[in-house]
């Protein structure tokens, strides 16, 4: 049978423990605050890299049992102007909620765009979505972004400064934006194109 410590013995052990230093507690709290601030700062820096532009907001109606239910649909283009861009669609009962969902959806559908040293695209490319067809081609430095509507927004947020774009077919902003995304997703650098075709860069240019 083991002897259990009495209440007086426990009290004497507690009395022998060194007193806690309030400075140590403050240091621990400051360290935790610094870690939280660093995490918050890094998240804010990542968010500040991205820009979003609303292409279109429209009211949509859904027929339900009690009548028609109205909501808002927002088409948003998200990009960091460094070769990444995405198009998102959000629906909600209010405009702010629809835009927020559109931004989140756009970040889930990002496309990487290979940029040339003069902030253009390496080759000509075509894209199609529904009845919309988009043709984009590289341009010389100083040309600017020759495009309109949602196509221009996509190209600018991708970081392209010199490009020519032509819209064929549908004028719907969503279809044109998605067609531009398809065209950008098909772009390849000269080096990757020569590697895929199994030829040298000199043969590619000749």
Curated annotation (Swiss-Prot):
Coiled coil: none annotated. Residues 50-113 form the S5 DRBM domain. The keyword rRNA-binding applies. Residues 24-51 have a biased composition (Basic and acidic residues). The keyword Cell wall biogenesis/degradation does not apply. One of its GO terms (molecular function) is structural constituent of ribosome. Keywords: Ribonucleoprotein, Ribosomal protein, RNA-binding, rRNA-binding. One of its GO terms (cellular component) is small ribosomal subunit. GO terms for biological process: translation. The N-terminal domain interacts with the head of the 30S subunit; the C-terminal domain interacts with the body and contacts protein S4. The interaction surface between S4 and S5 is involved in control of translational fidelity. This is Small ribosomal subunit protein uS5.
């Amino acid at each position: 049978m083991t002897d259990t410590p009495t209440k007086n013995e426990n009290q004497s052990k507690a009395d022998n423990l060194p007193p806690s230093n309030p400075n140590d507690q403050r240091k621990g709290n400051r360290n935790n605050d610094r870690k939280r601030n660093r995490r918050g700062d890094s998240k804010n820096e990542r968010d500040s890299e991205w820009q979003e532009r609303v292409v279109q907001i429209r009211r949509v109606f859904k027929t339900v049992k009690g009548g028609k239910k109205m909501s808002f649909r927002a088409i948003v283009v998200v990009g960091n102007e460094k070769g990444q861009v995405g198009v998102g669609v959000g629906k909600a009962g209010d405009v702010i909620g629809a835009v927020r969902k559109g931004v989140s959806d756009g970040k889930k559908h990002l496309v990487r765009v290979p940029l040339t040293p003069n902030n253009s695209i390496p080759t000509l490319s075509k894209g199609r979505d529904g009845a919309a067809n988009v043709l984009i081609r590289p341009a010389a430095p100083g040309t600017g972004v020759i495009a309109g509507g949602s196509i221009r927004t996509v190209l600018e947020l991708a970081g392209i400064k010199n490009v020519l774009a032509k819209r064929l077919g549908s004028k719907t902003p969503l279809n044109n934006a998605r067609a531009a995304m398809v065209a950008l997703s098909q772009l390849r650098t000269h080096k990757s194109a020569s590697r895929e075709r199994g030829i040298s860069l000199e043969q590619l240019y000749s």
